[in-house]
């Protein structure tokens, strides 16, 4: 329920019902979700492929992220850059993102361009170009992105080191963007094998929300998408992360003005019943200036410039990560001590009904803000179908949150936010080299 849904009146959200979404599975295994919304003459179309860095292995890490880029570089019918050119010509825009578990392609366009978009999506899924010059060009782009977002980013390099330390067995160990040596050495066979298994119709959920009819969407899907042959899906990820038996620490020395500290705790996968209590816990601790951590660490003690907690959607058990930015002159140890004290207070002191209610309202407010737009609903429908196993759970968020008790929040705090279950990554500013 991450990044999700205040007291907005549900009667004003008549569209927020599972019956508004119609589904059909094509003969090649692609599942299509359609929600008609005729308020504006636009359409959001999202393709969720169940392929991410967890489906890679040492030697080929980063391939899923590579295809986030490569899918815009031409196919059999629509050549290099034509996807973007045609999209722009028709008044639309597009994007894509890659996670540990998924690669998602997003299209937003006028309803008049629906058939063109179906045709272009089918073209790149079925007949993506592997022109060697384009592959090498995109390899360079990805390598440059890695340098910018990881190697030359204090937060990026610390986050990468945190993941590598927190996961010793599971594929969440390596970064989504890939290790540098792997990016340099992918072969054409590596690329084609990964694309064939991951970007196949039977490994995809397509979501269409907007000024369309379900009949028109399915007719076009059967015309353009259904002829694409199914493929062998990615092999299941069998490796489970073993229980962590003690605190782990990693220190990064890097040129920086101020230290950074990331503190991670292993938590269950998204579809686990503890997801909702953990959402409330995370919100209670770090959502806004009235949250516990902000009031204690930013306002009262003035130890940090900012503090937040976050979890990502995850098909397998993941992490809750607390991020601390200590003020100038504040040792990271002082900041983390205050954090640990607040976590201890959460575990051992009663949570008031008022505080619990506030956290739930904040979550509902975030959720409904996303549900107001066709792009937000397309994204959430795909997330719930993939991560929760059923898009219909999107429409029971309020009931799920309402069932969370203060005792539930304290229970998950005691179960997961423990010393032996945490990994601490600290970036210590490195003094500038003196030149004699």
PLM features: residue spans?
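Charge-rich, well-structured scaffold segments of protease-associated domains
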Residues: 25, 82-233, 251, 261, ...
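N-terminal signal peptide c-region/cleavage motif recognized by signal peptidases
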Residues: 11-16
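Active/ligand-binding-proximal structured segments within catalytic/core domains
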Residues: 29, 39-86, 263, 273-285, ...
């Amino acid at each position: 329920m991450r990044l999700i849904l205040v007291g907005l009146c549900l009667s004003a959200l008549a569209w927020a019902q599972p019956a508004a979404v119609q589904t059909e599975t094509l003969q090649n295994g692609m599942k299509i979700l359609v929600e008609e919304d005729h308020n504006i003459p636009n359409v959001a179309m999202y393709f969720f492929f169940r392929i991410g860095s967890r489906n890679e292995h040492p030697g080929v890490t980063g391939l899923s992220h590579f295809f986030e880029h490569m899918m815009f570089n031409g196919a059999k019918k629509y050549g290099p850059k034509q996807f973007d050119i045609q999209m722009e010509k028709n008044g639309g825009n597009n994007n894509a993102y890659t996670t540990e578990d998924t690669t998602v392609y997003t299209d937003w366009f006028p309803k008049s361009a629906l058939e063109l978009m179906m045709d272009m999506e089918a073209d790149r899924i079925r007949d993506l170009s592997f022109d060697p010059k384009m592959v090498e060009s995109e390899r360079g782009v990805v390598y440059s992105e890695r340098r910018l977002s990881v190697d030359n980013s204090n937060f990026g390099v610390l986050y990468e080191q945190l993941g590598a330390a927190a996961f010793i067995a599971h594929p969440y160990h390596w970064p989504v963007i890939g290790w540098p040596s792997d990016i340099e050495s992918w072969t054409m066979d590596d690329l084609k094998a990964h694309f064939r298994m991951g970007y196949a119709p039977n490994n995809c959920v397509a979501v269409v929300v907007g000024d369309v009819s379900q009949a028109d969407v399915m007719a076009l899907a059967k015309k353009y998408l259904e002829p694409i042959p199914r493929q062998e899906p990615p092999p299941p990820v069998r490796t489970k992360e073993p229980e962590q038996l003690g605190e782990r620490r990693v220190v990064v020395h890097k040129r920086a003005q101020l230290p950074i500290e990331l503190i991670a705790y292993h938590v269950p996968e998204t579809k686990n019943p503890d997801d909702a209590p953990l959402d409330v816990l995370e919100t209670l601790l770090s959502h806004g200036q009235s949250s516990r951590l902000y009031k204690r660490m930013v306002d009262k003690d003035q130890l940090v410039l900012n503090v937040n907690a976050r979890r990502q959607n995850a098909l397998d058990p993941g992490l809750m990560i607390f991020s601390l930015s200590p003020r100038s002159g504040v040792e990271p140890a002082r900041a983390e001590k205050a954090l640990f004290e607040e976590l201890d207070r959460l575990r051992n002191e009663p949570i008031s009904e008022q505080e619990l209610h506030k956290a739930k309202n904040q979550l509902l407010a975030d959720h409904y803000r996303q549900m107001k737009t066709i792009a937000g609903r397309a994204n959430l429908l795909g997330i719930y179908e993939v991560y929760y196993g059923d898009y219909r759970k999107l429409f029971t968020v309020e009931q799920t949150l309402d069932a969370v008790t203060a005792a539930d929040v304290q229970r998950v705090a005691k179960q997961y936010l423990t010393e032996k279950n945490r990994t601490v990554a600290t970036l210590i500013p490195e003094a500038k080299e003196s030149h004699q």
